[in-house]
């Protein structure tokens, strides 16, 4: 390994280490004190699942992850309203929570189409909220 490669690797590692990762269970989410913390939890748990949008079928591990995501996003969506930026923000938080509930139902039924749709709609809701309030 050359010195240049070593420094590049260390630099990339340092950048990756600076990105907040919060993998909190629902009972800990309710204790968060900043909207940024809530958003970090959502990104940490949702982004890996969003990559599965459109897949024709899912494995048992995916269904478990979708169930977990659905329950935790319902909590983060409710918690986000504690830091409300107005009625439109609250509406989007409620919408996200509703889509998370749909994801949980799809996971219970092991309905691939409904799960993919719920994930797509959750991601779209996140993007809409970020475009208006971030």
Give the label of every model feature segment.
Residues 122-133:
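The canonical Cys-X-X-Cys-His
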Residues 15-17:
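C-terminal motif of bacterial Sec signal peptides marking the signal peptidase cleavage site
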Residues 1-7:
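Bacterial N-terminal signal peptides that target proteins for export
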Residues 19-123:
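Extracytoplasmic c-type cytochrome modules immediately beyond a signal peptide or single-pass transmembrane anchor
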Residues 12:
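Residue-centric detector for conserved, function-critical "anchor" positions
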């Amino acid at each position: 390994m050359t010195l240049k490669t070593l420094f590049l690797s260390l630099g990339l590692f340092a950048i990756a280490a600076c990105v907040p990762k919060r993998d909190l269970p629902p009972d800990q989410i309710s204790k968060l004190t900043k909207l940024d913390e809530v958003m970090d939890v959502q990104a940490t748990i949702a982004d890996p699942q969003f990559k599965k949008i459109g897949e024709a079928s899912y494995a048992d591990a995916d269904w478990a992850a979708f169930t977990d995501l659905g329950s935790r996003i319902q909590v983060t969506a409710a918690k986000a309203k504690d830091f409300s930026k107005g009625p439109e923000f609250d509406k989007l938080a409620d919408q996200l929570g509703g889509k998370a509930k749909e994801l949980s139902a799809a996971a219970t039924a092991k309905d691939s189409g409904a799960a993919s749709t719920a994930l797509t709609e959750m991601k779209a809701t996140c993007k809409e909220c970020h475009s208006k309030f971030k």
